């Protein structure tokens, strides 16, 4: 399988004495679709911020053979690492095709951007097909449905040949059909890329995650398949407030002697 994996060792992020990420280790392999879950404040977004250079961190973060910590954000992006946020950042006045053109660095100037063209670069055409937006390529991005804007933003990463995608709650606010389509999209693009998803939607996670890391208080609490994580008593305690307990044994009738 082609692609590069993400390796994190003893990652720590501290803000004014508060440790938001506390000694995290992760191994995320190419072809994985890894979900990061956990309560609010568990350190999920801060971890991704550290990987992408938005916050200072100690430890080790490697993508393939490349060290990431200490590099500026723009250099990390040039290494094939991209992320999305909960609110899609697209150019709403421009068409879907123009958004992808800009992201791909296709070299079209502002005036030529305004003209339609017959030939579409291969990476742009492939991104349109992969995201299911081919029939909407001439629509302004601002009129797209919420889910379609998220797909466009993912497409803008694909045309840049991003190899590690870090997606922050990509299905927040989506309809059921949009969530299903997004899950299918993530499964397609993760076959030869490394994809990490921060998510709170447990139904979405159960349907599409290939593996799961549960964070709590800045640490990795549990890791494995969906079934393994769901069966972990420590995870149940964090989410339910108590560890799962076996059903109580049925009461055994006790004979009570009648008083004389």
What are these regions (language model features)?
Residues 2-260:
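Glycine-rich phosphate-binding loops of nucleotide-dependent enzymes
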């Amino acid at each position: 399988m082609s692609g590069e994996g993400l390796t994190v060792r003893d990652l720590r992020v501290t803000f004014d004495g508060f440790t938001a990420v506390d000694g995290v280790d992760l191994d995320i392999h190419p072809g994985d679709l890894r979900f990061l879950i956990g309560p609010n404040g568990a350190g999920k977004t801060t971890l991704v911020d550290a990987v992408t250079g938005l916050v200072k961190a100690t430890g080790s973060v490697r993508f393939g053979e490349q060290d990431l910590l200490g590099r500026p954000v723009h250099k990390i992006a040039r290494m094939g690492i991209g992320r999305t946020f909960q609110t899609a950042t697209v150019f709403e006045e421009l068409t879907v095709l123009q958004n992808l053109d800009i992201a791909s660095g296709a070299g079209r100037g502002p005036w030529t951007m305004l003209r339609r063209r017959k030939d579409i670069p291969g990476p742009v055409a492939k991104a349109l097909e992969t995201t299911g937006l081919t029939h909407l390529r001439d629509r302004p991005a601002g009129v797209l449905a919420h889910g379609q804007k998220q797909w466009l933003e993912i497409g803008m990463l694909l045309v840049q040949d991003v190899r590690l995608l870090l997606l922050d709650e990509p299905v927040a606010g989506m309809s059921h059909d949009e969530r299903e389509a997004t899950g299918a999209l993530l499964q397609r693009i993760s076959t030869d890329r490394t994809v990490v998803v921060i998510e709170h939607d447990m139904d979405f996670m159960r349907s599409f995650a290939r593996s799961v890391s549960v964070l709590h208080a800045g640490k990795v609490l549990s890791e494995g398949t969906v079934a393994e994580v769901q069966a972990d008593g420590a995870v149940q305690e964090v989410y339910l407030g108590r560890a799962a307990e076996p059903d109580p044994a049925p009461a055994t009738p006790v004979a009570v002697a009648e008083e004389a």
